[in-house]
Regions:
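Conserved donor NDP-sugar-binding/catalytic core segment of glycosyltransferases
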Residues: 108-142
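Short aromatic/hydrophobic "clamp" motif used to bind/position activated sugar donors
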Residues: 96
Length: 328
């Protein structure tokens, strides 16, 4: 793995990690928004998945301008999941945030979210309301993830909030306490891994929301949720090692839920309540139907995308990026 610039002697308080592959169109904006933060004791770790466009050139140029940027390049494209985990493995800060290469954070995002986490040792995650933008940066609308509802004492209530409602997992890109992520699932190599990590974090601590749009998430045609409709393509996007491997993402997600509830440090009564939450999970948000689609996808790889389009046409989109996209 190639690396550019790792000269800082003192560990920063915050790490922002950008995993990227062929991100030349939007990457510079993401870099600039990070380096322009009002809280300056941060590092920006970029892991490049062997990009073939100008990504490496852009990263090297900014690394020469600002010593807070640490650039790593993988010899081959490992897939998104390993690349997300690589930036975390290089993180030295007490607080950590993943930033998609096509998204932006406002100048006070780091200062405000870390201030909350410093004042709230019981919290593992802080994020803000999300402002959606289009490919040109135009406003599409706001998305309130209602993360404040996970700011409760009961782990089972937090788990229910993260698993039983329909949401687009944007809080995966919130500011985490790094110690809470240590030993966690991080980004698993399966569709729904972001949902699994948020559920695991809900068992480890409370989650706090800042009721102001401090992060901008971009909607465009090349976004993963739009570009990868077939099950095999989704699996390969997550991890190139699983190309052509049978994938049952809904079943995998449920198994991960079961494992995290069994391994979490919970009182017996609370563990029972968490298990009851997972029993309800099958009956909500089309999860049972998705499990059937996983099996059908063995012989009809395009069926997940077809099924999702039919559901959206008949019943509407889930809250989040699909709702914002329809406003264009």
């Amino acid at each position: 793995m190639n690396q550019i610039r790792d000269t800082a002697s003192d560990a920063p308080a915050v790490t922002i990690g950008i995993p990227v592959y062929n991100g030349e169109r939007y990457l510079e904006e993401a870099i600039r928004s990070t380096l322009a933060q009002t809280r300056e004791d941060l590092e920006l770790v970029i892991s490049d998945n062997a990009s073939t466009d100008r990504t490496a050139e852009i990263c090297r140029d900014y690394a020469l301008r600002d010593t807070r940027l640490r650039y790593f390049r993988n010899p081959v494209n490992l897939g998104a999941a390993p690349n997300y985990n690589i930036v975390f493995q290089h993180a030295r800060g007490r607080f950590f945030k993943w930033l998609a290469h096509d998204d932006l954070i406002t100048p006070t995002y780091v200062a405000k979210t870390t201030r909350v986490l410093e004042a709230r040792p019981d919290a593992v995650l802080c994020n803000s309301v999300v402002a959606y933008i289009d490919g040109m940066g135009g406003a599409l609308g706001l998305y309130d993830t209602q993360l404040a509802k996970a700011d409760v004492v009961s782990p089972s209530q937090r788990l229910a909030f993260m698993t039983l409602r329909s949401h687009s997992c944007v809080d995966f890109f919130g500011m985490f306490r790094k110690s809470a992520l240590d030993g966690s699932l991080l980004h698993g190599s399966f569709h729904g891994a972001d949902r699994a990590l948020l559920a695991q974090m809900s068992l480890r601590g409370r989650m706090v929301q800042i009721p102001a749009p401090l992060v901008k998430m971009r909607e465009h045609e090349h976004r993963y949720t739009r570009a990868q409709a077939r099950a095999v393509d989704r699996a390969s996007w997550h991890d190139t090692r699983v190309r052509r491997r049978v994938s049952f993402p809904t079943w995998r997600l449920y198994v991960e839920y079961l494992k995290m509830v069994q391994s979490a440090q919970l009182e017996p009564a609370e563990r029972i309540r968490c298990s009851a939450v997972l029993a309800r999970w099958w009956m909500l948000n089309w999860n049972a139907a998705r499990a059937v689609v996983d099996v059908v996808a063995l012989v009809a790889p395009g069926i997940p995308g077809v099924a999702e389009r039919i559901k959206v046409r008949l019943f509407g989109a889930a809250p989040g990026h699909l709702v914002a996209a329809r406003r264009r």
